[in-house]
Structure formats: structure tokens, C-alpha cells
């Protein structure tokens, strides 16, 4: 029987009072996804051989050491995580990774500049906002259809104008 390299489940987010405020879901992980988001290590089961291939978490980083590892293994590597719809862990949203966003963002930027080719990073920097907007629009069918319609109208208008 073949087991996945990374198996991940649900992470339940809880606030300071222990109330459930959210739950992770299955996500299609890609380099674009890792540019601004991550897979949480605490709801993952990772095959040991991956640490031998990609190294261990970078302990010089205070917040994003797991993010860096996943970026290298999944975003830039060939590892494909497999999702199981089971609750694995509770995540306290009052920890340093959720409350010290300035440090988290600075560390992420440091990692991106370290591991991504500069030309690719420049493209991501240039188009990150547009990609995030399109991702948000796709979650709302009516907004996505409206955007598609406007884009088609602009295409026809520009084509007509060139004549």
C-alpha cells in the first residue's frame, strides 16, 4: 500500500476563550498559494524521508520556519499533500504567528528572496494583488460572471477600436 508523503487534516481555530472560530479546509496547494499562505504543520503527518530530502525547519526563523519548508517541498518541489477530512488539531489564534504580523511578513519576505529565483519573485510581486482579487471573485459566482462579462466587452471594444 502506498502512503502519501504528506497527509493533512483539519485544523480547528479557537480564540482565547476556547470558542471555535474557524476550521481549515482542503486546499489545492501550488506555488501561487505559498506566495501568501501556508499549510499548517500541526495538522500534517510528514514522511521522514522528506526531511532528509528538503532539510529540517529553519530554526533561525521565529515564525515561518514551517512555511519555508512547505514552500520548498510543495511550492517549489514535487511533493503533493493528500487531504483527509478528519479533525487533527486545535489552533490557538493568540500565538505569535497570528499576533505578530509585522515579524511574520518580514520573515516571509526574507525567505521569498532567499529561495525563489528573482525573476519569478518579481512576477509574483507584480501580479500578487490581481491574483488574489481573481481568487476572491471566483468564490462568488455572480461576481466572477460579471467580471468575465466586463472583460469580454473590453476585449470586443479594443478589437473594434483597432480597426
Label each residue range with its predicted role.
Residues 112-116:
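TPR/TPR-like (Sel1-like) alpha-helical repeat modules
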Residues 117-118, 123-163:
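Membrane-proximal basic amphipathic "stem/tether" segments
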Residues 13, 23, 53, 62, ...:
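Context-gated lysine
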Residues 2-12:
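A short, conserved acidic/glycine-rich loop-to-beta-strand motif
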Residues 1-2, 54:
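Glycine-rich phosphate-binding loop signature in dinucleotide/nucleotide-binding domains
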Residues 5-7, 82-84, 121-123:
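A short coil-to-beta-strand element that immediately follows conserved catalytic motifs
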Residues 9, 16, 21-111:
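Conserved nucleotide-sugar donor-binding catalytic segment
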Amino acid at each position: 500500500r502506498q502512503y502519501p508523503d504528506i497527509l493533512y487534516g483539519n485544523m480547528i481555530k479557537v480564540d482565547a476563550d476556547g470558542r471555535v472560530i474557524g476550521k481549515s479546509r482542503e486546499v489545492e496547494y501550488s506555488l501561487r498559494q505559498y506566495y501568501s499562505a501556508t499549510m499548517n504543520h500541526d495538522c500534517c503527518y510528514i514522511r521522514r524521508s522528506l526531511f532528509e530530502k528538503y532539510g529540517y525547519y529553519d530554526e533561525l526563523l521565529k515564525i515561518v520556519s514551517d512555511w519555508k519548508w512547505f514552500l520548498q517541498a510543495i511550492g517549489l518541489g514535487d511533493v503533493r499533500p493528500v487531504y483527509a477530512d478528519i479533525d487533527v488539531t486545535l489552533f490557538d489564534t493568540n500565538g505569535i504567528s497570528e499576533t505578530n504580523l509585522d515579524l511574520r511578513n518580514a520573515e516571509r519576505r526574507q525567505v521569498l528572496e532567499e529561495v525563489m529565483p528573482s525573476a519569478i519573485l518579481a512576477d509574483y510581486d507584480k501580479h500578487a494583488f490581481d491574483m488574489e482579487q481573481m481568487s476572491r471573485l471566483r468564490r462568488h459566482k455572480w461576481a466572477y460572471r460579471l467580471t468575465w462579462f466586463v472583460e469580454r466587452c473590453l476585449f470586443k471594444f479594443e478589437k473594434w477600436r483597432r480597426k
